[in-house]
Amino acid sequence: MSGAEVVRMKLDHRKSSRCSIAGRWGTVLIMALATLLLGNPVPLATAEDEAQVQESARLIAVLLDSGRVAIGRNQDLINDPARGDKGFTPEVFAEQMIALFKERTGHDLRNLSTAQVPALAKPLLERLLEESKKTVATYQTVINVPGLKYKGLIPATFGTETGARFQLWSGIYLKQTAPEGLLRNPKNKPDAFESAALHKMEDPSFPRNGEQIVSEVVDGGKSVRVLLPLFYGKACLSCHGAPRGERDVTGYAREGAQEGTLGGAISVKLPLP
C-alpha cells in the first residue's frame, strides 16, 4: 500500500469518526428536546378548573361593584356641605359593602373561611375588601370638610382607584371599562375583547337582571376573562342622565342615559391552573 493510500485511509477514518460523533450528539439533543417538550407535558385545565376560575373572577367583579354601589348610595352624605364629620369611615363603608355582596351572592365575607366559594377566590376577596377600605380611607379628610359640595369620591373614582390598588398587590387584571362613546377616563379604555363584550351587552336582548356575565378562555387556554355589565340605575342618572351635554357635579358632560341602559362593565382576567 502506497503512502498516499495510507493517508487517504486515515482521513476517511477521521471523517467517519466525526460523523459518528455528530450523529450521536444530534440524537442526544433531539432526545433532550423531546423530553423537555413532551416528557413532562403541562396538563390542560379541566372544565371544572375553568368553572372555578370563572366564578372567582365573577365574585371579584361583583365585590368591586358592591363597593361602587355603597359609594353611590352615600353621595348625599359624602357631599353634604353642611356637615363636618360624616361618620362615613372605612369600617362603616365595609359593612355596607359586605352586606351588598351577601345580598347579591349569598356569601358572607365575615365568614369567608367556611363560605362555599372557590379556594382561589377567598384570599383575593379578602384583599379586595381591604384595598376598598384603603381607598375610602384616603378620602376621609376631604369627606369631612364642611362647606365643600363635591368631595371627589364617586363610584367611578372608587372603582378605578381600588382596581389599581388590587392589581398592584396581586398582579391580577381588574378594571372598569365602558363603551368608547361613554368613556370619561382614558385609563378605562376597552381593549378588543372588552369592546366586543360591551357590544353584546348593549343589545336590548341581553339580560338586565341577575349577574349575567360574558366570559371567554383566552391566551391559548391559559387565562379566563370575565366582564360583569353595569347598567344605569336611578341614582346614576344624576350624573349620567338628561339633559345630554349639561355639566354634572364632577364637571363632565351628561350622557343623556336612561335607566337600564349599559353604562360600562367590570373586567377581570385570571390565570388558569
Q: Which stretches of residues belong to each language-model region?
A:
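N-terminal secretory signal peptides that target proteins for export/translocation
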Residues: M1-A22
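Intrinsic-disorder/low-complexity coil detector
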Residues: D12, N40-V42, A242
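Extracytoplasmic c-type cytochrome modules immediately beyond a signal peptide or single-pass transmembrane anchor
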Residues: P43-F231, G245-P273
